[in-house]
């Protein structure tokens, strides 16, 4: 019989199976048809009516029919067939677009860089994880707004009535709006650490032997990518530290607002970078999330005259990032594929400066960029 298999990214494919096939055999079938690199058998979790299927059971035992469907997702570590539970993914994910959670995880220092490249300040997700994990973080479906509501409904349907809307929303919040991780949490429980703020020590933000490079002229900061200098919080010291009103007149914050209005997806890497450079300000934002979202969503003055900051990145964003000559060539090759330079740099940094992963990310999300 033909069996439909859905993914958490909204796509689906069909495989041919027998009702007597075991779940392990179905996983092997998916691996063979979709590729070992995409769906390795040992990392697959198959879900039917809100239940993770055990490897030794059969399709007929789990009442899987041709009219129904399975949901496939990947666990970071190999899933135990007899356990029947999803393993909680522990890889770090950047701050959510909705900014509704308050977890910031430490990031490893970047490698030595050299020549500057003017660009929009999209930080790298500098994680001590494998490249495949890095791409998973960069390309994972981080959703917001109407897309978030749609994802909530999809996950509720996936659970077959096992989860209510409040539970799914809480799981998504704890998972930084990453649906794959949220489903993991729904099956295995939401770790308490996922809902606790973890300030990033300043000692962890220093680069390892990186040569200092001055930012492009006109930049309001002396450090590349430093959107909110420590003085930003210090300047508010005489006022009420429980409010973010002082950000209204902050040039860096106005730049962030302009960019977020034109491309909401960049907010979460911005917040991650902020956590590395200025944990005190990030903590303040976490304590006043509603006010922060209100400030970000307010219409900015002169928007008609300023235009989209992604249209003229070199003029609008006088910051600099540090790249090696080899990385500069990689960026140019990605640009040659027809993508905007600012988007190329955003993807390149988000994929931990891996050209192949950045290319895949740009291709997979090209429709979103056009919107």
Curated annotation (Swiss-Prot):
Keywords: Cytoplasm, DNA damage, DNA repair, Nucleus, Repeat. Disruption phenotype: Slow growth with abnormal phyllotaxy, shorter primary root with fewer lateral roots, shorter inflorescences, smaller siliques and reduced seed set, with unfertilized ovules interspersed among seeds of normal appearance. Mutant displays resistance to mitomycin C (MMC). Increased UV sensitivity in both roots and hypocotyls, specifically in dark conditions. Residues 146-189, 325-365 form the UBA domain. GO terms for biological process: nucleotide-excision repair; proteasome-mediated ubiquitin-dependent protein catabolic process; response to UV; UV protection. Residues 242-285 form the STI1 domain. InterPro entries: Rad23 (IPR004806), STI1_HS-bd (IPR006636), UBA (IPR015940), UBA-like_sf (IPR009060), Ubiquitin-like_dom (IPR000626), Ubiquitin-like_domsf (IPR029071), XPC-bd (IPR015360), XPC-bd_sf (IPR036353). Residues 128-142 have a biased composition (Polar residues). The keyword Cytoplasm applies. Residues 79-117 have a biased composition (Low complexity). The keyword DNA repair applies. CDD domains: UBA1_Rad23_plant (cd14379), UBA2_RAD23_plant (cd14382), Ubl_Rad23 (cd01805). Gene3D superfamilies: DNA helicase RuvA subunit, C-terminal domain, Phosphatidylinositol 3-kinase Catalytic Subunit, Chain A, domain 1, XPC-binding domain. It holds the Pfam family XPC-binding. It is found in: Nucleus; Cytoplasm. GO terms for molecular function: damaged DNA binding; polyubiquitin modification-dependent protein binding; proteasome binding. Residues 1-79 form the Ubiquitin-like domain. Widely expressed in the whole plant. One of its GO terms (cellular component) is nucleus. Belongs to the RAD23 family. Interacts with 'Lys-48'-linked polyubiquitin chains. Interacts with RPN10 via its ubiquitin-like domain. Interacts with UBQ1, UBQ2, UBQ5, UBQ7, UBQ10, UBQ11 and IAA16. Binds to RAD4. May be involved in nucleotide excision repair. Binds and presumably selects ubiquitin-conjugates for destruction. Prefers multiubiquitin chains rather than single ubiquitins, with a binding affinity for 'Lys-48'-linked ubiquitin chains. Acts as a ubiquitin receptor that associates with the 26S proteasomal docking subunit RPN10 for the indirect recognition of ubiquitinated substrates of ubiquitin/26S proteasome-mediated proteolysis (UPP). Involved in UV tolerance in both roots and hypocotyls, specifically in dark conditions. This is Ubiquitin receptor RAD23b. The gene is RAD23B.
């Amino acid at each position: 019989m033909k069996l439909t298999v859905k993914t958490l990214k909204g796509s689906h494919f069909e495989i041919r199976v027998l009702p007597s096939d075991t779940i392990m055999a179905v996983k092997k079938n998916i691996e063979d048809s979709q590729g070992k690199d995409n769906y390795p058998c040992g990392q697959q979790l198959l879900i039917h009516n809100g239940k993770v299927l055990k490897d030794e059971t059969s399709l007929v035992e789990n009442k899987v029919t041709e009219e129904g469907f399975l949901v496939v997702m990947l666990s970071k570590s190999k899933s135990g067939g007899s356990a029947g539970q999803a393993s909680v993914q522990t890889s770090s994910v950047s701050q959510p677009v909705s900014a509704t959670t308050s977890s910031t995880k430490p990031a490893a220092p970047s490698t030595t860089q050299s020549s500057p490249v003017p660009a929009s300040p999209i930080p790298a997700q500098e994680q001590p994880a494998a490249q495949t994990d890095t791409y998973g973080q960069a390309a994972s479906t981080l959703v917001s707004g109407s897309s978030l509501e749609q994802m909530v409904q999809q996950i509720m349907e996936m659970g077959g009535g096992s989860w209510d809307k409040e539970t799914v929303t809480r799981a998504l919040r704890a998972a930084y709006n990453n649906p794959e991780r949220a489903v993991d949490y729904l099956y295995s429980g939401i770790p308490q650490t996922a809902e606790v703020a973890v300030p990033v020590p300043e000692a962890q933000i220093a680069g390892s032997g990186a040569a200092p490079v001055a930012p492009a002229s006109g930049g309001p900061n002396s450090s590349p990518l430093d959107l909110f200098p420590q003085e930003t919080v210090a300047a508010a010291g005489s006022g009420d530290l429980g409010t973010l009103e002082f950000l209204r007149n902050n040039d860096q914050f106005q730049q962030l607002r302009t960019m977020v209005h034109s491309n909401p997806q960049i907010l979460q890497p911005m917040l991650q970078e902020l956590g590395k450079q200025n944990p005190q300000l990030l903590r303040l934002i976490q304590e006043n999330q509603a006010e922060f979202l209100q400030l970000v969503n307010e219409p900015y003055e002169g928007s008609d005259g300023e235009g989209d900051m992604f249209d003229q990145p070199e003029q609008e964003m006088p910051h600099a990032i540090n790249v090696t000559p080899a990385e500069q060539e990689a960026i140019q090759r990605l640009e040659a594929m027809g993508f905007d330079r600012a988007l190329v740099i955003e993807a390149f940094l988000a994929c931990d400066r891996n050209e192949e992963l950045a290319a895949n990310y740009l291709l997979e999300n090209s429709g979103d960029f056009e919107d």
